[in-house]
Amino acid sequence: MSNITPGELIPADKPVEINADRETTSVTVENTGDRPSQVGSHFHFFETNPALSFDRKSAYGMRLDIPAGTAIRFEPGCEKDVDLVAIGGDRIVKGMGGLVNGELDADETREQAFERARNADYMEEQ
């Protein structure tokens, strides 16, 4: 028989550090829309609701730096500073807002995503 009680939690000696050793940035986000917008932890932040106004180029390849399964809500007319962290793994993004469909680090994918974002009013001409 084991000395472990069913359901017992045995914590590690040190706290788990999420998103360690990944590139990070911060952006100020304003919800210019007329209703709240909520963004989940693993959504490619560059492709969030076009009513959210922020520096999208700096958010390319990034997601919210928050625990998995959580989200941040942006209320209409309000500004909020958020921390972003680089998407990990193979860094392939498909779907979401339909702006990026491929390898995040490929120059062609990035330039096409910026063009799509400008054409769909996600970001201003730059």
Swiss-Prot record:
Its annotated compartments are: Cytoplasm
According to the UniProt entry, what is the EC number of this protein?
Answer: 3.5.1.5
Cite the entry's keywords alphabetically.
Answer: Cytoplasm, Hydrolase
Spell out the Gene3D superfamilies in the cross-references.
Urease, beta subunit
Q: Which GO terms describe its molecular function?
A: urease activity
Q: Which InterPro entries match?
A: Urease_beta-like, Urease_betasu_sf, Urease_subunit
Q: Which reaction does it catalyse?
A: urea + 2 H2O + H(+) = hydrogencarbonate + 2 NH4(+)
Q: Which GO biological process annotations does it have?
A: urea catabolic process
* Pathway(s) where this gene product acts: Nitrogen metabolism; urea degradation; CO(2) and NH(3) from urea (urease route): step 1/1
A Pfam family = Urease_beta
SUPFAM superfamilies in the record, alphabetically? Urease, beta-subunit (SSF51278)
Q: Which GO terms describe its cellular component?
A: urease complex
Family, as annotated: Belongs to the urease beta subunit family.
Q: What is known about its subunit structure? A: Heterotrimer of UreA (gamma), UreB (beta) and UreC (alpha) subunits. Three heterotrimers associate to form the active enzyme.
HAMAP family attached here?
Answer: Urease_beta
Q: What is this protein called?
A: Urease subunit beta
Q: State the organism of origin.
A: Haloquadratum walsbyi (strain DSM 16790 / HBSQ001)
Q: Which gene encodes it?
A: ureB
